[in-house]
UniProtKB/Swiss-Prot annotation:
UniProt keyword annotation of Repeat present: no
Catalytically driven reaction(s): ATP + H2O + 4 H(+)(in) = ADP + phosphate + 5 H(+)(out)
Name of this chain's protein: ATP synthase subunit beta, chloroplastic
Gene for this chain: atpB
Localisation per UniProt entry: Plastid, Chloroplast thylakoid membrane
Known partners and oligomeric status: F-type ATPases have 2 components, CF(1) - the catalytic core - and CF(0) - the membrane proton channel. CF(1) has five subunits: alpha(3), beta(3), gamma(1), delta(1), epsilon(1). CF(0) has four main subunits: a(1), b(1), b'(1) and c(9-12).
Membrane topology (UniProt): Peripheral membrane protein
Organism taxonomic ancestry: Eukaryota, Viridiplantae, Streptophyta, Embryophyta, Tracheophyta
Domain of life (superkingdom): Eukaryota
InterPro entries for this protein: AAA+_ATPase, ATP-synt_VA_C, ATP_synth_F1_bsu, ATPase_a/bsu_AS, ATPase_alpha/beta_chains, ATPase_F1/V1/A1_a/bsu_N, ATPase_F1/V1/A1_a/bsu_N_sf, ATPase_F1/V1/A1_a/bsu_nucl-bd
Main localisation: plastid
The keyword Transport is annotated on this UniProt entry: yes
One GO MF term attached to the UniProt entry: proton-transporting ATP synthase activity, rotational mechanism
PANTHER family in the cross-refs: ATP SYNTHASE, ATP SYNTHASE SUBUNIT BETA, MITOCHONDRIAL
EC number in record: 7.1.2.2
Amino acid sequence: MRINPTTSGSGVSTLEKKNLGNITQIIGPVLDIAFPPGKMPNIYNALVVKDRDTVGQQINVTCEVQQLLGNNRVRAVAMSATDGLTRGMEVIDTGAPLSVPVGGTTLGRIFNVLGEPVDNLGPVDTRTTSPIHRSAPAFIQLDTKLSIFETGIKVVDLLAPYRRGGKIGLFGGAGVGKTVLIMELINNIAKAHGGVSVFGGVGERTRGGNDLYMEMKESGVINEQNIAESKVALVYGQMNEPPGARMRVGLTALTMAEYFRDVNEQDVLLFIDNIFRFVQAGSEVSALLGRMPSAVGYQPTLSTEMGTLQERITSTKEGSITSIQAVYVPADDLTDPAPATTFAHLDATTVLSRGLAAKGIYPAVDPLDSTSTMLQPRIVGEEHYETAQRVKQTLQRYKELQDIIAILGLDELSEEDRLTVARARKIERFLSQPFFVAEVFTGSPGKYVGLAETIRGFQLILSGELDGLPEQAFYLVGNIDEATAKAMNLEMESNLKK
């Protein structure tokens, strides 16, 4: 972090104006720039092109140095469109990496990758800024406390609980509900959370970003009357941005979160949607820089880039960052290098299944694929652990029996297996839940279910006390009492029809 010196009108200090270069080549978002001998900028330095195009329109493009090519030339990646740039244009070396505003001034506002506000609410105080490139906290600074982060979502809290100050990944292919789940987590956690939240929209739809902003304003997380009272900062680098912006916008959001953790000593929530787009942008940039592609066409530096980002998302003795990251899974293949590299960094993984989404079970979380390092008896307690294991065993047995059921039918199963199947189907439906953010789609009000209620509900199903209830009574309800009430209503309706 640094307190900025007084800058001249152009926003670049007079001292820094001395180091000027010229564009020698433009290949899409990649620029080659020649500098005077002995005046070469460092890797990651920000370069600024300020000029006018052929029709007199003002150009202001910021780039980041990626390679030193020799012969006093550098190769840089642009953070915005390079339309209108021509060879020979003057380039200013700012002498420092990209820096973005941090602290209370960021709350309630929407920023782009450069830390410029894009919400038409006026300028932001830029006296306190922080460079987006910095090293991860030292090993001795890390905090290792273990505690559960309750989300109010049954399937998550029971089977793959989240760690406070941990890293959580939501894995899923296209259209299975990653963004809806992340919005629900923002709704359930960020609203009740005393600290601040930072949302990084990395290479996703602009519409999704707009929906989230409106939702935040309606719920009061962003306070329109007094913007300083807001609880969230939003950083967007959407699908239409050049790869340089999509590759760096995650670091911009993380830098803002780190300031709240390190300087304000707060507990921070960091939401990133979508971490795969960060990898995808890195792959595009890597190809443009002329690097040899690695497995499945990804960049050879995939592990390094992911590690550099993920190791900064951590909890220290000053404060914590709990991060929830959506991870797109290309072609539903979890062995693809992008999701596979992400897995290694996470404390909990919530895997979304297309099969469950096709059945209409939302959230479509796969109870057998989702994992958490927190699901241990010494952390969650014996009762929670035992219930979770029995639920998984029942669902696993049902999965094993599905082939037999498909060929021979339910009647060929033993009495015990028939009972297991009936309970597994109830469990599967009871793992669904109406979301607050999906009220407009489902027509049913959202439900927050506490952990104790969740455990009680599944224990009742496993014990056999509810074997007499129809399985549709367990679909899209909150706690178990709602399921029994729904069963009574279904019975009354069927009696009336008779």
